[in-house]
């Protein structure tokens, strides 16, 4: 640690997280040097609250930086649903870009509390109705029954999750999740589909999306790359990962899709 601090004198705090730690505290992280870590960061002029000890990760995903930029550039005046929101950074970026309404959905209200802090940092107006701490499956069903629809839906689920309400499985059940949210998207709206499963190849993922596009009501609009400074591999397109991400440049595979509705004659 001493050598690290000499080489990188700007370091104020070091946290060690043990993936296979025997306690939850070890997995979420223990401060081994310095004071309390920073609780906010800024990206593209927007503030994001963070809590480095909240979970096993850093509470903020750098790999979706290009997607936050896309949200800021494309969602002005739009109504947005951020499913599996975690700490809500995609929704925060949408609001920073001028979205008129963002619904942040995650079954863990503790994660959504970080999103609320981000709203405060940016002086965004907030309402209890902007945050929905419910399981994805019943929450989406309720939105359908009450006639809610959106210009853009972010679908960024965990690799695997199972509750008594339903199963999320990015390796075998991603199409089901997409079909679950499609009815909520307005004509010419966007469905942003993210699959970060390292065991799902880029070609397999893309093929599954192309199969969903066969009816003509869904189309692939854009593939967003992960920032090069995040890829973490000497040659991210070489197939050295568990599954080759090509044509994506990382196992975090981001696709912007356009949605069409059947128009009443």
Model-flagged regions — what are they?
Residues 101-106:
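Conserved SAM-binding motif I beta-strand of class I
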Residues 190-265:
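C-terminal catalytic and target-recognition region of SAM-dependent MTase-like enzymes
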Residues 1-61, 69:
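Non-catalytic substrate-recognition/targeting regions of SAM-dependent transferases
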Residues 77-86:
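Conserved class I S-adenosyl-L-methionine
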Residues 62-78:
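Conserved alpha-helix/loop element of class I SAM-dependent methyltransferases that forms part
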